[in-house]
């Protein structure tokens, strides 16, 4: 067994992963996991008490994390004319219109988030089968369909992220790097949790935050006590 494997096993023997921990305790457990050669991402997986088959219970939105994600985003902007020039000036990594649409149709998706001006959505909408499954489709609800491309780019650079429940009612979101201070990780997770609670559909009945787990890229999943999160 490798040294990394032995340390993971030591963590697993020290803690009971069948029980929930407070958010602070869960973060501390991740921090105790063995170091690797890269800065691991802290991921959140939330099972929501919704029925995604119902149109009024499909969860999708965005939230600005107070400390960002620690990830340098590759931002693509669908725009033409003056708006394209604004996007370039604002630091977008890829800017274009029909040329980008055709490139993506060919299978290219080497970017992390897409922004589009409203006039581009007729063409961008044709990319649904490519962008949709990858959560890359711009939407008004997430603020990525907008005439103010400069503001959208700035917000994304500062740590604005999107969240979306899948067909099983689960949201999976990267919220920080493990190198962040514990307090920074905690505040980012609390911001996401508050946004999820705010997005709760009026028609959703019963327990809303069914299961809440945090993990690092190479570490174990730690269940967080949802009673603490609901009380935020």
UniProtKB/Swiss-Prot annotation:
The intrachain disulfides are none
* Database matches in InterPro entries: Ribosom_uL1_bac-type, Ribosomal_uL1, Ribosomal_uL1-like, Ribosomal_uL1/biogenesis, Ribosomal_uL1_3-a/b-sand, Ribosomal_uL1_CS
**Can you provide one Gene Ontology molecular function annotated for this UniProt record?**
rRNA binding
Gene Ontology process terms (BP)? regulation of translation; translation
- Keyword Repressor attached: yes
Signal peptide residue numbers: none
GO CC terms of this entry: large ribosomal subunit
Residue ranges spanning the membrane: these are none
- A Pfam family: Ribosomal_L1
Q: Name the Gene3D superfamilies on file.
A: 3.30.190.20, 3.40.50.790
Q: Which UniProt keywords apply?
A: Repressor, Ribonucleoprotein, Ribosomal protein, RNA-binding, rRNA-binding, Translation regulation, tRNA-binding
Question: What is the purpose of this protein?
Answer: Binds directly to 23S rRNA. The L1 stalk is quite mobile in the ribosome, and is involved in E site tRNA release.
**HAMAP family tied to this protein:** Ribosomal_uL1_B
Task: Describe the family membership recorded for this protein in Swiss-Prot or TrEMBL.
Answer: Belongs to the universal ribosomal protein uL1 family.
Quaternary structure annotation from Swiss-Prot or TrEMBL:
Part of the 50S ribosomal subunit.
Name of the protein described by the UniProt record: Large ribosomal subunit protein uL1
Q: Where does this protein come from, organism-wise? A: Chlamydia muridarum (strain MoPn / Nigg)
